[in-house]
Amino acid sequence: MQEEKVNLSRRNFLYIAASGLGGIAAGATAVPFIGSMLPAADTLAASKTEFDVSTVAPGQLVVIQWQGKPVFVVHRTADMLKRVKGHDDLLKDPNSEAIDAVQAEWMKTPEQRIYRSIKPDYLILVASCTHLGCIPLFKPSAGRKEWGDSVPEDWPGGWHCPCHGSYYDLSGRVVNGSPAPHNLHVMPYKYISDTTVLIG
C-alpha cells in the first residue's frame, strides 16, 4: 500500500474557511433573534413621558399617565412646603431611607429626601398606595377638617387611601399605623428645561 502525502496547507485552508462560514451563519442567525428581544420603538416611546409642570396651578394636583400608571403632579404652595416639616414622629420613614423602598437615584441630599422632589415646589409621585395599589385621595388641608378623628389635630394634610386607611403627608411619606409599608414611590425623572420634566 502506498501512503498518500496529505496536503496540510489545503486542509488548514478548508478548516479555516468552514469555521469562518459557520461563524458568519451563527451571527446572521443570532442578530435577528437578539433584535427581537429588544423593545419596539413605540414601547420605548411609552416608557418616557414629558410634562410641563408650569401648567399646574399652585395648590393643585393633576394626574398624568406614565407606563400605564397614574402619576400625581402637585404644585406645592409655600404653606404646603412649611407643613412638610415638623412631624417626623408621625412618619414611618421620614427621611426616605428604607432600603427596600422604590426611590429615585437623585434623592441623595437630606432636603431631597424630605421634600422628595428635585424642585421642592413640584412633587411627582406614582399614584398608587404601597399597601395594595389603590389610588389615594389628595386632601391638602391641615387638621381634622377633611380627615376626621383618625389623624392628629395638627395633621399637616396629604393623602388618604380609602381602601384600607393608609395616610401620607404632603411629601407622600407614610404615617405610622398605616397598613402601607412604604412612602409613595418616586419614579425616575429629570428636568429637561426649567418647567418640563421627562419621567422615566
Q: Where is each model-derived feature located?
A:
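Extended interaction regions within the primary functional domain
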Residues: 1, 40-41, 122, 139
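C-terminal segment of N-terminal export signals and the immediately downstream linker at the start
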Residues: 26-69
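N-terminal secretory signal peptides and thylakoid transit peptides that target proteins
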Residues: 2-21
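Extracytoplasmic/periplasmic/luminal assembly and interaction segments
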Residues: 63-110
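Short low-complexity stretches enriched in small and charged residues
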Residues: 18-32, 83-86, 154-156
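Rieske [2Fe-2S] iron-sulfur-binding domain
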Residues: 92-200
